[in-house]
A protein has these predicted regions:
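Bacterial Sec-dependent N-terminal signal peptides
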Residues: 1-27
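Structural signature of tandem alpha-helical TPR/SEL1-like repeats
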Residues: 49-62, 82-96, 118-130, 152-153
């Protein structure tokens, strides 16, 4: 009888120790309010470049801008997504991106491209002149500026 009780007790302990437990479900990540725009921006980047979902990326960028209207990278990427599909909207977003950081040469370059696509050559000449001053080592600025002067006559 003792042997049976001991065997039963050991079996219960063994089964209890190695029994399969239900996995814990991880809660959704909590994002601080100060990082909400950045979080939505990174979600948009993931959707655009990993999942190739440009519509979802655009929606994430727009939500990022709603969360933080001074977050320049979201304006920049939104303009980049729209540059060849909706040039007027891309120009508005590129102007916003440039206003958030007037020292960023990538924002300035995108603004110049958007101005060219919207046939605003005089504005593009001013933009590329400034870009030439900011990034004097970039030969493309000189080439585009020469083409713009040729276009204007």
């Amino acid at each position: 009888m003792r042997k049976t009780l001991l065997l039963l007790l050991l079996t219960a302990v063994f089964c209890g120790a190695f029994a399969r437990k239900t996995p814990q479900v991880a809660p959704a990540p909590q994002v601080p309010d100060s990082l909400r725009g950045f979080y939505l921006f990174t979600e948009g980047i993931k959707q655009a470049f990993i999942e190739r979902e440009t519509a979802a990326a655009r929606a994430s960028m727009e939500r990022s801008i709603q969360a933080d209207s001074t977050y320049g990278p979201a304006w920049y990427e939104l303009a980049e997504l729209l540059l060849y599909n909706d040039a007027p909207a891309a120009l508005r977003h590129a102007e916003h991106a440039f206003r958030t950081d007037t020292t960023d040469k990538w924002y300035l370059l995108q603004l110049g491209q958007a101005q060219i696509l919207n046939d605003r050559y005089r504005d593009a000449i001013r933009t590329y002149n400034r870009l030439r001053e900011v990034d004097a080592q970039n030969p493309d600025s000189y080439r585009v500026l020469a083409m713009l002067y040729d276009q204007e006559g």
